Amino acid sequence: MTNETYSSPAPIPLSQSDERTWAMIAHLSVLANLVTGFFGPVAALVIYLVYKDRSRYVAYQSLQAFVFQLIWWVGAGAIAGIAWAVSGVLSAILIGLLCMPIACLISFVPLAALVYGIVGGVQTAQGQDFKYWLIGDWVRNTLTEA
């Protein structure tokens, strides 16, 4: 028996068409939140983990989508929960009724995240680079350091 070492083959790079498709799917995974409430960030993370070694473009776009969706999911949920709790407590003294319109508006803010994710999906499908405001540079720096 010989002493042979086997190494895994180098990952096969994605074609530009496949890169655009997977980047688009990562951004559009935000739509999964409409049905499941949580699957969007999971889908974007899975895409990142599967394709990070095969395409820096897909890695960047999918990690951006994951971070963006996670921030929106946690942040918007916490803010809406607090707004409704304050409104509910204060409604006992009628001041809360004044807070309810604000709580309703805050409840609809996650729709902006859906629209932003769709814009990202459309732009990446067209082959354009998409960068989420405030998140994109941080993700790019994180990937560069890795």
Where do the model's predicted regions map?
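Hydrophobic alpha-helical transmembrane segments in multi-pass membrane proteins
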Residues: A23-A43, F66-G117
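Membrane-interface extramembranous regions at the lipid-water interface
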Residues: T2-L70, V119-A146
